[in-house]
Amino acid sequence: MEYAYLTDPGKVREHNEDSVIIVKNHNNEYLLAVADGMGGHRGGEIASSIAISHIGKSFRELGKLGKKEDAILWIKNVVSEANVQIYKYTEENPESSGMGTTIVLSVLTKEYLLFGNIGDSSGYVYKDKQIHKITNDHTLVNLLLKSGEITEEEAKDHPRKNVLMKALGATTNVEMDIFDVETDVEGIFLCSDGLTNMLEDEQIAKVLNEETTAEEKMNKLIVKANNRGGTDNISVAFLKKDGELSDN
């Protein structure tokens, strides 16, 4: 397995409100996660950091995920715990009112591959030199698109593109969408919208196809997004499979 993750403030924002992680546990299982925070007074930075720290720590401490049903339950529970932590922080620090974060994650074991998301950070599988989006964005624009009120072209530059219908930490309860995916993929790729607002899927895939290391690929994606304006924080995480997962 080769993997790398990277985050960058971009060219416009003063602070980086994204957080990103890849963790391997004792059972040779992998967690990838990206969070894109929002809110004033560094609130977004705190929200995404709480989410990623809690989820990463819990995964590290977990001996193994177990069966697929157990893993789905773990994902739902750990995300719910992170949600409560962010919500409580807001209650104790009123100046951070309105803070929250997106979260997209993926877990890979020998037996299964799962994705989960809240918000508009994206999860993809990498296969046959292409990336295929697994997650669905919880945005107003995506709702309008699915209901047929706007076209895909209109969605790209819609003035309310950043309006989220769901975020971690915004309410006491939040439900994560879980996706059960076939394991016969060549890689997993997660990113915040700071990348997808700058680059098309084909441009991302082109970089992933290059004969370079995972770290070099992640660096190049960030450089490309910044060259196109870097209007937001940019976070990327990529795991390239090299055959089957072993038990050690």
Task: State each model region's role.
Residues 1-248:
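PP2C/PPM-type serine/threonine phosphatase catalytic domain
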